[in-house]
């Protein structure tokens, strides 16, 4: 460490930290460490005065590294962003939230833990490297796949920023399913009004190129420079396939708006669809009422059956979101045509969020009868009527009504276009075949950088939500519609001298950011990479490291960790905490003054899936008593599968420990959400007690 100059700075946080930690003692010890050129203590390092002092030292003393022992690295990020030195050569040491505040009742142990953390951080920073953002040329052209209302609106919004747009549609015409509708809800205006305006804007905008009868043939490239091969069918392509047109589009971003398809109720034979002509679907209703002027006057008694195929494990297990409102709208149209029309809606649950409750109230006021119960049978009664039999769960009796028309409220399912694109582009879909990412945090993303979803390819939704999602997707795409894109440099790096080309990194990368070079070695596309670190955790040879956290750094930190920093009888735990949830829960424990034992040293990782089994095994082999990996619950993982992979890998380590006659309980995984500081503290307490019962790690050398 003598070849570099390190500045070590302690913040007292206006005296708070000195109440629990002997900072003067730590500062004196730090000044004697190899490579440490200056040690300072300041009551408020994040103040202008404190920041200025660090900058002055960097300039005058020629510091190569800066270590700040203060609050959590999750805090004050802007204040410490520019210290006059490459930000990747600055190390934040959390001695407040996860040390002084969590162990304020035991200053001696808090100081010992702070000393251990400081030593590990100094070792880590020794291996830190200056990294610079990478700038990559890009194009201001977007590709929008799907010509329904979502795709059209996304194209118009993007073109409005000055970018060029290619809008491709599989069918010979634009408009999607909306072009088949009779009326929108809640205003009950005709879709033709909005569509004609959209078509006019498309036609008049020279930046938008519309390609109908077109499909994606092949797809390659990266965000900013996707290469997409498009085939456009000619009108006589059946007779002369060679007349099909082929072109390649270079696009900076892609909007996926591949729409939806209606559920086919034919398998539900109890409803007679396809057998009884008086039984139609809700989409059939739209088409007939739009095309046949007298349709709404023909039926004097009409029954709507909700959830046909939806919320049914045999067919569509999910709610399709729009069906209740569609039936209420259609029922109101019947009442508008003839107020004496008898209308029944058979339902499981009526779902009318927000202002849509007004339409539900209007429907009840107009005399539409709502009967809670799903009909068991629909049959012809011999007199030209359709008999609908249902058990009314509110009245507690079976009811049968004779009607002229039955409308089945069928749900939405993912389109064939989405399924086809899944294979062509390499999309990730959920179990229902809708395009998926992290629904809570990144609902418009597709798990593929530079590709965003709009409309019903993501989930069932109505027209207004589809248009809303299109605008949001267009806004997110703008980042990639630039002359050049700047990429964070902390993406993973592969050491090809260690790599045996096993392909594990490629298989487990949730962003599909890996490909292989001409020699078969993995290479990462920095534009596709989300820097989750799952590839680093996957490599059985430890050949992959992140720019900001390397295998070498982690191994070095283990070497300098005092395995008995609290005393010979106290277990030492090494904790790997995911930065999005578990680490923040640990910080919150400190902020709330929640006490827990000082036996754990935590290392923040981008995802629990970034922890390599080699490091876990190395920690145990070097005498650490226990290793805890804490990450998001599976359903909340920001990188979809990181937590699940971490648990699988940890199970493998446990089995190896058994073979070594070492207790497998020395490694464990904990699911801890961002808002569970109490659970975090309780987890540490329980683990410390369990390790005390197990006794000292037999590999610990005193």
Give residue spans per PLM region.
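Residues forming the flavin
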Residues: 1-574, 578, 583-585, 589, ...
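Divalent-metal-activated hydrolytic enzyme cores
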Residues: 664-702
